[in-house]
């Protein structure tokens, strides 16, 4: 005997499974221009003796906008260069800067500096830009993530990517120049290496 209620339940279950599976596959990034950055969240355990939690930030790179910068970031992240590197300069309402293994803001990688690749991409909340000295062609390994719009940087620094997931964790990075208890990158790697 046909039971229409049973059919409705089966269809509902199948629909729910489809939603769950599509959300799970959306989180399974497998793209050479996606980076997975795991960062600490010191302020969640500042008053305890516990290790800080590690949170994931997903970054989309812009090879069509800044091919040399993207290549350098991908090369360094594939080598593990950014692992355990602190956020050494974090200014509320502006940005969080990292990428210097010395933690001073004066260091970089052994790779050559990169020529500027300025574009019309604006610096907005979640934008990743390359840090540099006053010389436009001095970017190397240091980069920053904007907390908010920073239009005064437009055309002055190279935009190479954006945060597409986990911006709430970037917002939670400890402030300071340098912070008393700096957060760090635990791991930064291309999603295809995951």
Model-derived segments and spans:
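Cyclophilin-like peptidyl-prolyl cis-trans isomerases
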Residues: 2, 21-194
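Bacterial N-terminal signal peptides that target proteins for export
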Residues: 1-11
